[in-house]
């Protein structure tokens, strides 16, 4: 199992190109099942989760051609199976996203219950209730969700009783081929859902209310292929900005957008960063200053994203002052606290809130990654620690960060992958 060896260094400085969004590319890849022609996707990140989704689509029979590192061409017309097997689904929760497209296009879907990060209970009951409201019959058998329809799915008015990104994506993809009008209330509003909706529109779907909490879909009989470029990764963008701020550095990130990261940028400015932006770039400069502690509370978009919480905890660990970080989305997403405390961080837990008292520097220690974003917080902590930090179980990082060691090295950091 690979590990990272990180030597604490000075401020991060330089320029980076941000990759395409993992959390947009995964549902977009699943959505290609809906098309009747080839779909050419650009700016697809080279990540383990993307490879898993491609392997899943190939298992279903889709023909996939990869051109270079970031272009994927999908021909969905060769599909010959409607079963997403446990062997693939167990490694990545986003596998559930083939459920809606398979059911809508082919009338049948057999999908194993999903896996992925161990960050709490993320039930799929809203996905299933929404599909049943569209006329699907669903049973759970042997660890599989088995969904069927007679005739086309039927448009419906469905209120999601909690905001769910995956549920919104699955029901949106099912609704585009349903008969009649579907209204999805309390829909998630994340930029990645906007990106998925824009792809579906490019394929011929009729969707209004994109970017709002009410999506209205007029079902069509078929969708075509198209060319589409995946949006930039806002969490990767935020991670490198936070790392630069924690290290008192100066960076410029290209092929990204400030408009998808407003809540994070506000907190970085609170921490003392000078942030300037352009149409496709963000620059951050700490002017050599120690960051100031910033308190935050995670909530659905457009509020502060749960996927950036752990990175800010690493920043607050070396910030001037005391901060409160409250996690409201996932119940187990403060797991990085124990590892950060091994490095000398002063953190106390009160229910779902971490109280962080900043120290001048952390101290290197062997630590273990537990999920994707907690892993990123440990990398940031290693960069602002005295000595060499060894991070185990970095396969979590490889699920969501493209070439992370090379990118940090380009900013002057000492991050080495050690093959086991």
From Swiss-Prot:
UniProt keywords, alphabetically: Cell cycle, Cell division, Cell shape, Cell wall biogenesis/degradation, Cytoplasm, Peptidoglycan synthesis, Pyruvate, Transferase
The reaction(s) this protein catalyses: phosphoenolpyruvate + UDP-N-acetyl-alpha-D-glucosamine = UDP-N-acetyl-3-O-(1-carboxyvinyl)-alpha-D-glucosamine + phosphate
Modification sites for 2-(S-cysteinyl)pyruvic acid O-phosphothioketal: 117
Residues that hold UDP-N-acetyl-alpha-D-glucosamine according to the record: 93, 307, 329
The keyword Transferase is annotated on this UniProt entry: yes
Main location: cytoplasm
Cell compartment(s), UniProt: Cytoplasm
Protein name: UDP-N-acetylglucosamine 1-carboxyvinyltransferase
Species this protein is from: Cellvibrio japonicus (strain Ueda107) (Pseudomonas fluorescens subsp. cellulosa)
Gene: murA
């Amino acid at each position: 199992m690979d590990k990272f060896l990180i030597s604490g260094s000075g401020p991060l400085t330089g320029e980076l190109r941000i990759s395409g969004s993992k959390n947009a590319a995964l549902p977009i890849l699943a959505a290609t099942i809906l098309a009747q022609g080839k779909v050419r996707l650009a700016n697809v990140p080279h990540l383990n989760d993307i490879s898993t989704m491609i392997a899943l689509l190939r298992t279903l029979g889709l023909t996939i051609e990869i051109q270079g590192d970031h272009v994927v061409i999908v021909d969905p017309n060769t599909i010959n199976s409607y079963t997403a097997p446990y062997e693939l689904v167990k490694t990545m929760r986003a596998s559930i996203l083939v459920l809606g497209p398979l059911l809508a296009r082919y009338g049948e879907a057999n999908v194993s219950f999903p896996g992925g990060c161990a960050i709490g209970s993320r039930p799929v009951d809203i996905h299933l209730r929404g599909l049943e409201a569209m006329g699907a019959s669903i049973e759970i058998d042997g660890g599989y969700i088995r969904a069927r329809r007679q005739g086309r799915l039927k448009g419906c008015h469905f209120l999601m009783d909690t905001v769910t990104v995956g549920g919104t994506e699955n029901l949106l993809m099912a609704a585009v081929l349903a008969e009649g009008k579907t209204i999805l209330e309390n829909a998630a509003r994340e930029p990645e859902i906007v990106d998925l909706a824009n792809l579906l529109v490019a394929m011929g779907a009729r969707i209004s209310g994109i970017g709002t909490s009410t999506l209205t879909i007029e079902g069509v009989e078929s969708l075509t292929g198209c060319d589409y470029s995946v949006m930039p990764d806002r969490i990767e963008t935020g991670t490198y900005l936070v790392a630069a701020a924690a290290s008192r550095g100066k960076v410029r990130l290209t092929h990204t957008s400030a408009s998808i990261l407003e809540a994070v940028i506000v907190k970085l400015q609170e921490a003392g960063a000078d942030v300037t932006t352009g149409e496709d770039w963000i620059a951050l400069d700490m002017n050599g200053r120690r960051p100031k502690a910033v308190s935050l509370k995670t909530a659905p978009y457009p509020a502060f994203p749960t996927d950036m919480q752990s990175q800010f905890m690493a920043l607050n660990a070396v910030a001037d002052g005391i901060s409160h970080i409250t996690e409201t989305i996932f119940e187990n997403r403060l797991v990085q606290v124990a590892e950060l405390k091994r490095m000398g961080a002063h953190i106390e837990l009160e229910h779902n809130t971490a109280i962080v008292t900043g120290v001048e520097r952390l101290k290197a220690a062997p630590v273990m990654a537990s999920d994707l974003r907690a892993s990123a917080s440990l990398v940031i902590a290693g960069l602002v620690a005295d000595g060499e930090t060894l991070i185990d179980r970095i396969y979590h990082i490889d699920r969501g960060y493209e070439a992370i060691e090379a990118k940090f090295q380009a900013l002057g950091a000492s991050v080495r992958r050690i093959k086991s």
